[in-house]
From Swiss-Prot:
GO terms for biological process: carbon fixation; oxaloacetate metabolic process; tricarboxylic acid cycle. One of its GO terms (molecular function) is phosphoenolpyruvate carboxylase activity. GO terms for cellular component: cytosol. It catalyses: oxaloacetate + phosphate = phosphoenolpyruvate + hydrogencarbonate. The active site is at H138, K546. It comes from Klebsiella pneumoniae (strain 342). Keywords: Carbon dioxide fixation, Lyase, Magnesium. Belongs to the PEPCase type 1 family. Its EC number is 4.1.1.31. Its cofactor is Mg(2+). This is Phosphoenolpyruvate carboxylase. Forms oxaloacetate, a four-carbon dicarboxylic acid source for the tricarboxylic acid cycle. PROSITE patterns: PEPCASE_1, PEPCASE_2.
Length: 883
């Protein structure tokens, strides 16, 4: 740990020095001196020097408008470099043990040591592994793609500099390259000027596949195979690839009017084009590698007389021609041209798999396994993991849009207004129509624009090549009719296959009713017959936490999953739980291993399907090596959860959780919904209103343009509180509820829960993480600078609550300080605080200046506005998340 941390500190210090030299070259010694003075004051302030803290505040308040931007940029860029160094150290040879591929070896050894598990059971669990990662655009990566590319290269330089045997000349060249990259970053505008379109977001997702996952996935499988061979004497079958990728970019239209049927159609084509492009590069490599002559009779027959000389090459060249023709056809479609379909148009994975696998089998049979298991095996595994679509797309739409569309249809048909019918009448109508062989609507019907959009989306799904759409997710699902409605709309569009339709239960009430809704659906004969023994249900983390607070939401999520698992098991249905976790803790984020092991027993039997959100994609999959670590962590957690499931919670533990949930929810809603001062306080103490100016994602920040906190999306809600360091949504109500249970004489039970129940210990661990990032003096400074004195009492009350909460959690965990069991993370937060604190102070100052100008009816100073955006990006980097 110490060796790793000192290596990280020395790299961070070296990068900081290079950044300092860059600033001096660009802006002169004076600005660098100013930045260095602020850094030293911040360090001393963190060490508890009150006089230096006051001097830090005064220095930042007195910066001229010309100094604001360089100072903000200096600290923001430093944090990006620190994050890059930290990402590198998590995968370096002396990196954090928990994130190395070794984690699989440790898990396999642990499983082998269990007296009740034999090797066959472990092999079966490996073969049933299923991991589907769903990439989403929001909260949206705040860092520009151009800067991400530079940081990837910085990472590569750090890796090479770590080599102890490097020659002086090479060391000099690498340092020169580092200086160039950091100078390029400094002279690049870190805030993008325009909001990305849904197509831009999709391209960002494809870039992650190309730059990291394309190499990372086969390398992870190679690593997994080696560990299985070493520990179980077992090799993965060639066609076994447990990892798949899906995307919401270009498919998620919930609250985003910019994602239309045409956009989805375009993104589907673009995704296929990118896949073709990447497979073309692979095949080109194989053409140069597979020059062998000896082959099996089967392969010779496939190659024919023309390919007799170099059969493998011949087949690869044939595949290359097919890929090029497919790419040209897709390019024409993307430009709006209609070309006749080429005879060899690639639309199915089998068309890629068959020639590649034929070559693989032949090489193995002819004693050339060493060649077969090289680039060729990697390409075969990419066919299984990415295939023709590259990433599949989920369609997501809000339930009310379907209800409104059906209402318009029934009114047109003169059979009443579907929207006003009872749930029983809706179900009766839907089941009747689903069983009917005739279409519901005449072809000449002209719907409204909103309804046409819903119907056109269903048409896009029906026309898409099979396998390119993964699921239809219904947000804000509340009733069985919400699910049946989508099935009817898809039937009307002429869909020729059974697409998984997943209700998303995301408020406290909906989570509590989820099992009833699914039980009713499974009791409908048509439904049971149609789903063919498989059901996907999505659990919403971010909206439930925003609705009820983290403690009540996490217990509702646990109970909903637990009940659904038991209901589906009883009904003989294979359940896939789809976890809509955010990156931040207030939106359900948690370290993967801990989060998975804290779920109810049996929750991963149907595999893991989970959203990977915005900025977390870069942290977890930004480099091939990091991808291997992240996938290894998921793999070990799924194996452990399925073979060593966590205990069923005791009845008294459930009772305590029910009490914690009830007390925390009342307190959370008491502030957020019922306190008349809360919304004005939130609006003034955080940069919530200013966040709208950041050109982040393609999706509006609010579901409805007007409205208070309840209409605000979970992401800006969390983002705003993260910026002012109160982190309120991630803890409000939780500590006070724990305190009440302690006062009721149940501290020893809470300690036992913390010790013996992964669900509860993970919950407390997440609270500790939030408390470590929260900061009382900074939150108070925002109040003093930005909030009217008549609202100060509310801020004081909230900060007192936070301080008391920290003490109660430490008492239950029997620790003297936060993050005692994760010193690596505690050190990392402390290191970044020195650079984040000045950005927070500066942000409060900039918000003050910006709002003063607005109140005086003046146009805001562009230097102030730009510096404000930079502080927002910088604090997000310091906190390691946006929303």
């Amino acid at each position: 740990m110490n060796e790793q941390y000192s290596a990280l500190r020395s790299n961070v210090s070296m990068l900081g020095k290079v950044l300092g030299d860059t600033i001096k070259d660009a802006l002169g010694e004076n600005i660098l001196d100013r930045v260095e003075t602020i850094r030293k004051l911040s360090k001393s302030s963190r060490a508890g020097n009150e006089a230096n803290r006051q001097e830090l505040l005064t220095t930042l308040q007195n910066l001229s408008n010309d100094e604001l931007l360089p100072v903000a940029r200096a600290f923001s860029q430093f944090l990006n470099l620190a994050n890059t160094a930290e990402q590198y150290h998590s995968i370096s040879p002396n990196g954090e043990a928990a994130s190395n591929p070794e984690v699989i070896a440790r898990t396999l050894r642990k499983l082998k040591d269990q007296p009740n598990l034999n090797e066959d059971t472990i092999k079966k669990a490996v073969e049933s592994l299923s991991l589907e990662l769903v990439l989403t655009a929001h909260p949206t990566e705040i860092t520009r793609r151009t800067l991400i590319h530079k940081m990837v290269e910085v990472n590569s330089c750090l890796k090479q500099l770590d080599n102890k045997d490097i020659a002086d000349y090479e060391h000099h060249q690498l340092m020169r390259r580092l200086r160039q990259l950091i100078a390029q970053s400094w002279h690049t505008d870190e805030i993008r000027k325009y909001r990305p379109s849904p197509v831009d977001e999709a391209k960002w997702g494809f870039a992650v596949v190309e730059n990291s996952l394309w190499e990372g996935v086969p390398n992870y499988l190679r690593e997994l195979n080696e560990q299985l061979e070493a520990n179980l004497g077992y090799q993965l079958p060639v066609d076994f690839v447990p990892v798949r990728f899906t995307s919401w970019m270009g498919g998620d239209r919930d609250g985003n009017p910019n994602v239309t049927a045409d956009i989805t159609r375009h993104v589907l084509l673009l995704s296929r084009w990118k896949a073709t492009d990447l497979f073309l590069k692979d095949v080109q490599v194989l053409i140069s590698e597979l020059s062998m002559v000896e082959c099996t009779d089967e392969l010779r027959a496939l190659a024919g007389a023309e390919g007799a000389q170099e059969p493998y090459r011949y087949l690869m060249k044939k595949l290359r021609t097919q890929l090029m023709e497919t790419q040209a056809w897709l390019e024409a479609r993307l430009k709006g041209q209609k070309l006749p379909k080429p005879a060899g148009l690639i639309t199915q994975n089998e068309q890629l798999w068959e020639p590649l696998y034929a070559c693989y089998k032949s090489l193995q049979a002819c004693g050339m396994g060493i060649i077969a298991n090289g680039e060729l095996l990697d390409t075969l595994r990419r066919v299984k993991s990415f295939g023709v679509p590259l990433v599949r797309i989920d369609i997501r739409q809000e339930s009310t849009r379907h209800t409104e569309a059906l209402g318009e249809m029934t009114r047109y048909l003169g059979i009443g207004d579907y929207e006003s019918w009872s749930e029983a009448d809706k179900q009766a109508f839907l089941i009747r129509e689903l069983n009917s062989k005739r279409p519901l609507l005449p072809r000449q019907w002209e719907p409204s624009e909103e309804t046409r959009e819903v119907l056109d989306t269903c048409k896009v799904i029906a026309e898409a090549p099979r396998g390119s759409i993964a699921a239809y997710v219904i947000s804000m699902a509340k009733t069985p009719s919400d699910v049946l409605a989508v099935h009817l709309l898809l039937k009307e569009a002429g869909i020729g296959f059974a697409l998984p339709v997943a209700p998303l239960f995301e408020t406290l009430d909906d989570l509590n009713n989820a099992n009833d809704v699914m039980t009713q659906l499974l009791n409908i004969d048509w439904y049971r017959g149609f789903i063919q023994g498989k059901q996907m249900v999505m659990i919403g983390y971010s909206d439930s936490a925003k609705d009820a607070g983290v403690m009540a939401a996490s217990w509702a999520q646990y109970q909903a999953q637990d009940a659904l698992i038991k209901t589906c098991e009883k009904a003989g249905i294979e359940l896939t739980l789809f976890h809509g976790r955010g990156g931040s803790i207030g939106r359900g984020g948690a370290p993967a291993h801990a989060a998975l092991l804290s779920q109810p027993p049996g929750s991963l039997k149907g595999g893991l399907r989970v959203t990977e959100q915005g900025e977390m994609i870069r942290f977890k999959y930004g480099l091939p090596e990091v991808t291997i670590s992240s996938l290894s962590l998921y793999t070990s957690a799924i194996l452990e959860a399925n073979l060593l499931p966590p205990p069923e919670p005791k009845a008294e533990w459930r009772d305590i959780m029910a009490e914690l949930s009830d007390v925390s929810c009342k307190m959370y809603r008491g502030y957020v919904r019922e306190n008349k001062d809360f919304v004005p306080y939130f609006r003034s103490a955080t940069p919530e209103q200013e966040l709208g100016k950041l050109p982040l994602g393609s999706r509006p920040a609010k579901r409805r343009p007007t409205g208070g906190v309840e209409s605000l999306r979970a992401i800006p809600w969390i983002f705003a509180w993260t910026q002012n360091r109160l982190m309120l949504p991630a803890w409000l109500g939780a500590g006070a509820a724990l305190q009440k249970v302690v006062e009721g004489g149940k501290q020893s039970e809470l300690e036992a829960m913390c010790r013996d129940w992964p669900f509860f210990s993970t919950r407390l661990g997440m609270l500790e993480m939030v408390y470590s990032k929260a900061d009382l003096w900074l939150a108070e400074y925002y109040d003093q600078r930005l909030v009217k004195p008549e609202l100060w009492a509310l801020g004081t009350e909230l900060r007192k609550l936070l301080a008391a909460d920290i003490n109660v959690v430490l008492a239950i965990a029997n620790d003297s300080h936060l993050m005692a069991d994760l010193p690596w993370i505690a050190e990392s937060i402390q290191l970044r605080n020195i650079y984040t604190d000045p950005l927070n102070v500066l942000q409060a100052e900039l918000l003050h200046r910006s709002r003063q100008a607005e109140e005086a009816g003046k146009d805001p100073d562009p230097r102030v506005e730009q510096a404000l955006m930079v502080t927002i990006a910088g604090v997000a980097a310091g906190m390691r998340n946006t929303g």
